[in-house]
A protein has these predicted regions:
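Low-complexity, Ser/Thr/Pro/Gly-enriched N-terminal "stalk/linker" regions
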Residues: 1-96, 121-141
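Well-ordered alpha-helical scaffold segments within catalytic/enzyme domains
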Residues: 16, 101-114, 163-178, 211-222, ...
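Solvent-exposed loop and edge beta-strand segments that line ligand/cofactor-binding
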Residues: 60-64, 80-97, 148-161, 194-207, ...
Length: 635
């Protein structure tokens, strides 16, 4: 099944529509200023400045001048290690502008149209001026030394940046019908396809994304070269002799490349290892290639990796990446809450991976995991004001420790106004603005609803309107009007709802779906009652021993201290009723009182108290400086 184009979807959901409008009205104008280094107190971006420097170098060369040469041997460049006219920032700095453009393409229909349209055109002009004559586009090498391009695929990010360029171009073409950025992306893709492939130059991205993006370009343009090059990158990755060995002039056993998921062929990988974002981007690209090439072995490998993530490494919030060391996956069932990394980009990548596997094999589990990641980690990575963001998303935080303990330095207690490594803020913006494309799918005979998302959708079968009251209440109405032809409706029933009803009667699920033949305009009134649930971990997750997490509907909740001396002093009475009130869960519990001694033979005094849980996506927005998803219980 293929996703319905976001061009035909208007999100009206009470949870997501305000967030999309915030992206259009606040987030994107704010990020535009950041990219121009115009926000006082925010880390310097240098993104736009780099494009302008590259354009100047290209123009000077065309006029017969010489191009200056600067070092291209670093991950990060600043005024301490580089000259003023050289490239500044991270090697992937270009991608921030591309993600901004993609988010703008999706956000324009929801507000601030004139501003976003004008700035998008300005951005495209900036990018066009920085493209080399042969289509190559990466400001680091255009500024610092074009002769060194494609010489360090392992560490530097030319192909990764291209991936975001191509995705932005596809979004702009799809949503606005503008070819300008698509033409730029196709010229860049043609340069890559001429360079890499069978009988050409070997190699593959150190940071995956080009694979998925090339498939997306193929889906938009129909140009087979793009699919073939994506397939080449996937098939040759990790094969012997190892390309990264050849590139570096060494001979290793491949363990150095676990971080890049390039230690062995993807079809031989059975566990998710290495950098979490790179991993899910690679898996999404591989699943996309498998879909279009019919490579069953590759599809099976992707499913194996999915099962490893889903069963042993996925946080209850939909976060991925257990350790800050390498921003990486950890061992099975190692899911620390306080040291969790859970990069926002990893949850976004998990959604991409879920979508691509769903397209290969429509299974309810993919939509369920996408919902978990979107409603909890992705939604919580951006503040209500649209100007502050989380990079890491631990499931437990203590203000003093987060500020002073080295192992927690990666965990900002509060959302930040920007980062010098700013991959997450524009990523969250583009996923939020484009969320509709992950919710609705169709083939010749079937319309599938995979996310509980309020929206108006123009489908091949007629007009679909979904009126949702989630997550506040369970009312979920599906209206089909202007029917063009009969079809089969497949509605994924939320796995958190034990007793879904249709017109007051219990719904019978078939593999997680409500299925009905639609032959006439109709209205289906479902109720997915968002009851409170206690969640327990597999016993092998040591960090959660003796603890429970609370959820209501699709939202995971976090306990805040409300003045208690420590989050660890609070215990939930799991036998008492839990009340939902004003968006929070209230429960009976106890607070242990500290004494004068670090250790004592007397048990601490337990004082009854009321515990307050808020949605994880709204955590630490006020004065609170401690929170925990998994809490001790009296059981």
């Amino acid at each position: 099944m293929e996703p319905i184009s976001p061009k035909h979807i208007t999100v009206t959901d009470p949870f997501w529509a305000p967030r999309i409008r915030t992206v259009a009205d606040i987030v994107l104008p704010y990020q535009w200023q950041v990219l121009h280094d115009q926000v006082p107190g925010a880390p310097k971006s240098s993104c736009i400045a780099n494009f302008q420097k590259a354009a100047h170098a290209i123009a000077a060369a065309k006029a017969g001048g010489s191009r200056p040469t600067y070092p291209t041997d670093k991950w990060y460049y600043d005024d301490k290690n580089s000259q003023e006219k050289a490239f500044m920032g991270w090697v992937f700095q270009d991608s921030d502008l591309y993600k901004w453009l993609e988010a703008a393409a999706y956000a324009i229909p929801y507000g601030n149209r004139a501003y976003l349209t004008e700035k998008s055109r300005e951005a495209v002009e900036i990018i066009a001026a920085a493209q080399e004559a042969d289509g190559y586009l990466d400001t680091l090498y255009s500024i610092n030394g074009l002769q060194n391009r494609f010489t360090n695929l392992k560490d530097y990010h030319e192909l990764y940046c291209f991936g975001h360029l191509a995705q932005a171009a596809c979004a702009r073409w799809t949503m606005q019908g503008e070819r300008d950025l698509l033409d730029i992306a196709c010229r860049a893709a043609d340069c890559i396809c001429r360079t890499f492939g069978k009988g050409k130059r070997p190699g593959y991205p150190g940071h995956p994304l080009a694979e998925l993006a090339l498939v997306q370009l193929y889906e938009v343009t129909g140009k087979a070269d793009y699919l073939q090059t994506a397939d080449f990158f996937i098939r040759t990755r990790g094969t012997r002799p190892l390309f990264f060995d050849r590139e570096r002039g060494v001979d290793t056993d491949g363990s150095d490349y676990i971080y890049n998921q390039a230690h062995c062929p993807l079809t031989a990988q059975t566990t998710a290892v290495g950098h979490a974002v790179r991993g899910v981007y690679l898996y999404a690209g591989a699943a996309a290639v498998a879909e279009h090439t019919g490579n069953r072995a590759l599809q099976a490998a992707c499913e194996t990796l999915w099962q490893d993530l889903y069963r042993t490494k996925l946080y209850v919030t939909g976060a991925l990446g257990q350790t800050a060391v390498g921003e990486a996956f950890g061992p099975a069932y190692y899911l620390p809450n306080d040291l969790a990394y859970g990069e926002s980009c990893a949850s976004a990548g998990l959604v991409f991976f879920a979508q691509r596997l769903y397209r290969c094999h429509p299974h309810a589990a993919y939509g369920a995991v996408a919902e978990l990641a979107l409603w909890n980690t992705v939604a919580g990575a951006m503040s209500a004001d649209g100007c502050h963001f989380y990079y890491a998303n631990p499931l437990e935080a203590e203000g003093v420790l987060n500020d002073t303990v080295p192992e927690r330095k990666h965990q900002a207690l509060r959302r930040q106004n920007w980062f010098d490594c700013a991959c997450c803020p524009p990523n969250v913006a583009r996923v939020t603005a484009g969320i509709g494309q992950y919710g609705f799918y169709a083939d010749d005979s079937t319309l599938a609803i995979e996310l509980p998302l309020g929206a108006q959708v123009d489908t091949p079968f007629g007009q679909l309107q979904i009126i949702s009251a989630l997550p506040e209440s369970g009312d979920f109405t599906v209206k089909i009007t202007r029917l063009k032809r009969p079809f089969i409706l497949r509605l994924r029933l939320p796995d958190w709802c034990k007793c879904p009803t249709l017109d007051g009667q219990p719904v019978t699920a078939k593999d997680g779906y409500y299925v009905q033949q639609i032959t006439a305009p109709t209205t289906l009134r479902f109720c997915f009652a968002p009851t409170v649930r206690l969640l327990y971990s597999d016993a092998r997750v040591g960090a959660n021993a003796g603890r429970v997490a609370l959820s209501r509907g699709g939202l995971i909740y976090a306990l805040e201290t409300q003045g208690a001396p420590s989050i660890h002093a609070l215990t939930l009475d799991s036998k008492s009723p839990i009340v939902y009130r004003d968006g929070c869960l209230l429960a009976a519990g106890t607070c242990l009182q500290g004494g004068d001694h670090l250790y004592t033979t007397a048990p601490p005094k337990a004082v009854p108290c009321t515990l307050r849980f808020i949605p994880f996506c709204r955590r630490l927005n006020g004065k609170e400086d401690q929170m925990a998803v998994w809490v001790r219980t009296t059981d």
